[in-house]
């Protein structure tokens, strides 16, 4: 990349084998370039080559280069295109290779040549479809990349060629997690010579998971030979440049249509780069500027849409309908959730975290121009996200072992059982169970454990508790029936002695499945007791004593005594969890952005003192990194500090953690809760106490009213007793809130026993909380209406505990 002709000092560039030196032969000063006319010829057919004057190194499209960016380790890339740009005088677009040393051993294909780390070839490269810009000063030298046959037959690796000779036989995605089958790299080079856009498109379709596409299976199965034949077939259909210009006015729609089709095949179709990429159009049609001058731009868009529609309309409609049905139906077992850690084909360019290579310095778009520090901040935020996949679960070894042994024993003995897992939100209950299932799956694949089925039912995702019957029967039979029929079929199925695999059912958010008759819970805990059921139920809830307080004796007795409690994380454990995620960073990014140990300890202690919720600790740290990134970018804007900042590490300090915590404390919801009167806070305290006492997320309004009055009666703290001392030494909070008004309470004839059942203006208080989104109310009759929180319980607790009067109740 050269921003101007001045940056080409020491280099020469050539167009169509005609030397166009960019320096004056006498003075060595840059000369004014002549205007590049687009009228006589198409610039898309011009190929640019470069020559370094120092060592006469020549670079052209298709060359393999050794590139070093920002003092990082040198990496290998193939030159996809050299072109004149809009923002820069010259753009050098490359596609990166990933070295074997940058691939995690666990991510390598499960084949014989990658079985042991000691047998891996350190000179093996993996081609990716990730595109990037490089600067002329970052180019070190050319390298040789050979196919597997050439490498094994003709090459001996020694110190003389170890750094310049490589082998490539597979491609992979930018994260080094998804790999292609073995191919002949020489055939891939032939495809590049014929059409470098099809070359990138071929790698991209083989390595990047696609979103829904009716023809995706067909595209995945294409080999390099098929793609070469396809390119050869397309060649005769292309028009010559002169023919396109002559026919521009008469056949405007057709040529525009061809250009739009070519754009669809390009790997960087961002709207802000269409004009800059006009010279690299695959079909070599007229420039986009000519197309913009067309008198019928709308017709072009309509034609583009028609080109993308498959010929087999009925098949396309059926597949679309099947796809939509599988997504919108919560009961379809074939519904798959896409993994967030894998890039999508819809992205303009996938990320490349494992290469440790800077993406440039412009910062003008997401695929090109992200410096190393920004990439470090980005990866750090990804690792601190709660959805990040972990290789292990720290600080939950004992609970993991208990669940693992119970499930393994039940599977081996082919018996049913119930397991109750309890703990506050964010302590790793569901994650631990899923990790146990994953470990058991690996044992099954290795043949060391009997095969089993697994089903996860989340109470919050069910329209009603009875839907659990439908999901379980669908897992067993693959058929959808009504809940009532499913219950009958399940009862008959588990009663019969038929060959079946053990079935593990994870019932998450158990308190949401509780009904008045409790028949759903009874059946799910009763079926494992059948001798031939082989049903293993794992019930997960937030409170340990929920079976005794909520479920009847006949249900709690069937649940059994296999109970595992997850206690809240201590501040040492939270610190270990955060450090475990920081260890997942690449070595380069670890040096660029550092979270101080004091900052980790501060965040851990703050969260551990409230709830021990690991999700909250990670969220605070992630927000602190965002605040630190903002400070970094603002300091980078100072021209004097830019070079110094780029070469130094940036630290996330306690001040950043403190700001992140203050944001949660001073959020709009927190400020609204702080402004509420005592009576409204008392209602919220009653909701929290009732939830704690019952273990249920939803509680009746009548129970909350009783909880409020009982709490005030039992209030014995100094602040609670003397809060009304200035008005009347004998007046209590019950007299004030449950009387008919302050003036009547001050009347000497008022009897404290003559109080109302509810506090004054109670209906107005509840409606205010509902309208502001704090509570949700299911109106089924006033006293029997169900109330549940609409915001985080932790946020309400943190606000109420800062209130002297109300904190005594909690």
UniProtKB/Swiss-Prot annotation:
Residues 286-295 have a biased composition (Basic residues). Disulfide bonds: none annotated. GO terms for cellular component: nuclear origin of replication recognition complex. Residues 57-183 form the BAH domain. GO terms for biological process: DNA replication initiation; mitotic DNA replication checkpoint signaling. SMART domains: AAA (SM00382), BAH (SM00439). Pfam families: AAA (PF00004), AAA_lid_10 (PF17872), BAH (PF01426), ORC1_wHTH (PF21312). ATP binds at residues 423-431, 509, 542, 615. InterPro entries: AAA+_ATPase, AAA_lid_10, ATPase_AAA_core, BAH_dom, BAH_sf, ORC1/CDC6, ORC1_wHTH, P-loop_NTPase. It is found in: Nucleus. Residues 219-235 have a biased composition (Basic and acidic residues). Keywords: ATP-binding, DNA replication, DNA-binding, Magnesium, Metal-binding, Nucleotide-binding, Nucleus. Residues 21-30 have a biased composition (Polar residues). PANTHER family: CELL DIVISION CONTROL PROTEIN 6-RELATED, ORIGIN RECOGNITION COMPLEX SUBUNIT 1. Belongs to the ORC1 family. Component of the origin recognition complex (ORC) that binds origins of replication. It has a role in both chromosomal replication and mating type transcriptional silencing. Binds to the ARS consensus sequence (ACS) of origins of replication in an ATP-dependent manner. This is Origin recognition complex subunit 1. It comes from Debaryomyces hansenii (strain ATCC 36239 / CBS 767 / BCRC 21394 / JCM 1990 / NBRC 0083 / IGC 2968) (Yeast). The gene is ORC1.
